[in-house]
């Protein structure tokens, strides 16, 4: 029985649960449930604090886990990424009061508040900067105003929270984070149940990044159309009743869907349809 950790709440939880559901795994019906057994797929899911997931996986108690890259790195647990999942993207940066030009070197001998002390200490050591790192469990932005810290290191999304507290981010990004599937370093990658779950999740993540495009194309324009929609290996081309036309099907990156459709229409293609895909394999 495969044992998999899933975030029990927060920004990562909803997306992780959605991906697993799309991959064909059982969902919990009550948010208070701490575990869900999926006997059909031989998997048991455990709903844990995102910050603790890498620790459980790294200890070998659980086989796989979904958490944030920043949380996994900060845990110090012996885990490695198996898949990047494409949701919950954020950056982890230093921030300090606005009104002056800050450099990372200015943090020398300063107090830095953060919920990710190991990540910050690792970066400071790499830079040769000595500073006091103060661990807080949340709301680190207010720590400067309350006189607890001189600067902070935190997850930055839109930057709205920083602006509300008159803070400005500076320096290089410490970590570009997103939801990731992690496993213990040295895990057995020949395990069938493990590889099946990875393949299913990978198929859902891939499907979220692509659209299936179908269109009719004059035969004399096919070569030009294929240049616009090369697909992964090659597009599917099928004959139509009208011998002067063919039907073409190809995967296109979701972010380019509309521009590709515009180019095909300008070329002379007809009946251009874009369809969502839910999952795929062997890509």
UniProtKB/Swiss-Prot annotation:
<keyword id="KW-0460">Magnesium</keyword>
<dbReference type="InterPro" id="IPR011322">
    <property type="entry name" value="N-reg_PII-like_a/b"/>
</dbReference>
<keyword id="KW-0808">Transferase</keyword>
<dbReference type="InterPro" id="IPR018198">
    <property type="entry name" value="ATP_PRibTrfase_CS"/>
</dbReference>
<keyword id="KW-0479">Metal-binding</keyword>
<dbReference type="GO" id="GO:0003879">
    <property type="term" value="F:ATP phosphoribosyltransferase activity"/>
</dbReference>
<dbReference type="GO" id="GO:0000105">
    <property type="term" value="P:L-histidine biosynthetic process"/>
</dbReference>
<dbReference type="Pfam" id="PF08029">
    <property type="entry name" value="HisG_C"/>
</dbReference>
<dbReference type="InterPro" id="IPR015867">
    <property type="entry name" value="N-reg_PII/ATP_PRibTrfase_C"/>
</dbReference>
<dbReference type="Pfam" id="PF01634">
    <property type="entry name" value="HisG"/>
</dbReference>
<comment type="pathway">
    <text>Amino-acid biosynthesis; L-histidine biosynthesis; L-histidine from 5-phospho-alpha-D-ribose 1-diphosphate: step 1/9.</text>
</comment>
<comment type="function">
    <text>Catalyzes the condensation of ATP and 5-phosphoribose 1-diphosphate to form N'-(5'-phosphoribosyl)-ATP (PR-ATP). Has a crucial role in the pathway because the rate of histidine biosynthesis seems to be controlled primarily by regulation of HisG enzymatic activity.</text>
</comment>
<dbReference type="GO" id="GO:0005524">
    <property type="term" value="F:ATP binding"/>
</dbReference>
<keyword id="KW-0028">Amino-acid biosynthesis</keyword>
<dbReference type="InterPro" id="IPR020621">
    <property type="entry name" value="ATP-PRT_HisG_long"/>
</dbReference>
<dbReference type="GO" id="GO:0005737">
    <property type="term" value="C:cytoplasm"/>
</dbReference>
<protein>
    <recommendedName>
        <fullName>ATP phosphoribosyltransferase</fullName>
        <ecNumber>2.4.2.17</ecNumber>
    </recommendedName>
</protein>
<keyword id="KW-0368">Histidine biosynthesis</keyword>
<keyword id="KW-0067">ATP-binding</keyword>
<dbReference type="InterPro" id="IPR013115">
    <property type="entry name" value="HisG_C"/>
</dbReference>
<keyword id="KW-0547">Nucleotide-binding</keyword>
<dbReference type="InterPro" id="IPR001348">
    <property type="entry name" value="ATP_PRibTrfase_HisG"/>
</dbReference>
<keyword id="KW-0328">Glycosyltransferase</keyword>
<comment type="similarity">
    <text>Belongs to the ATP phosphoribosyltransferase family. Long subfamily.</text>
</comment>
<dbReference type="GO" id="GO:0000287">
    <property type="term" value="F:magnesium ion binding"/>
</dbReference>
<keyword id="KW-0963">Cytoplasm</keyword>
<dbReference type="InterPro" id="IPR013820">
    <property type="entry name" value="ATP_PRibTrfase_cat"/>
</dbReference>
């Amino acid at each position: 029985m495969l044992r998999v950790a899933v975030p029990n709440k927060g920004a990562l939880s909803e997306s992780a649960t959605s991906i697993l559901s799309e991959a064909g795994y059982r969902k919990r019906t009550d948010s208070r449930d701490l575990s869900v057994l999926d006997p059909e797929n031989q998997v048991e899911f455990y709903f844990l604090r995102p910050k603790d997931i890498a620790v459980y996986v790294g200890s070998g108690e659980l086989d796989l886990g979904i958490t944030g890259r920043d949380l996994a790195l900060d845990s110090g647990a012996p885990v490695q990424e198996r898949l990047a999942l494409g949701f919950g993207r954020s950056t982890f940066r230093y921030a300090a009061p606005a009104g002056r030009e800050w450099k990372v070197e200015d943090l020398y001998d300063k107090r830095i508040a953060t919920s990710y002390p190991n990540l910050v200490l690792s970066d400071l050591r790499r830079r040769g900067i000595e500073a006091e790192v103060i661990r807080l469990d949340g709301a680190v932005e207010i720590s400067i105003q309350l006189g607890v810290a001189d600067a902070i290191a935190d997850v930055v999304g839109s930057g709205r929270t920083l602006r509300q507290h008159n803070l400005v981010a500076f320096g290089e990004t410490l970590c570009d984070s997103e939801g990731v599937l992690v496993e213990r370093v040295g895990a057995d990658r020949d395990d069938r149940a493990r590889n099946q779950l990875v393949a299913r999740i990978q198929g859902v993540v891939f499907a979220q990044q692509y659209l299936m495009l179908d269109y009719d194309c004059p035969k004399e324009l096919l070569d030009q159309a294929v240049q616009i929609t090369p697909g992964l290996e090659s597009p599917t081309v099928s004959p139509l009743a009208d011998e002067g036309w063919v039907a073409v099907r190809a995967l296109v990156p979701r972010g380019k869907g509309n521009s590709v459709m515009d180019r095909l229409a300008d070329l002379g293609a007809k009946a251009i349809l874009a369809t969502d895909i839910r999952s795929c394999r062997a890509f």
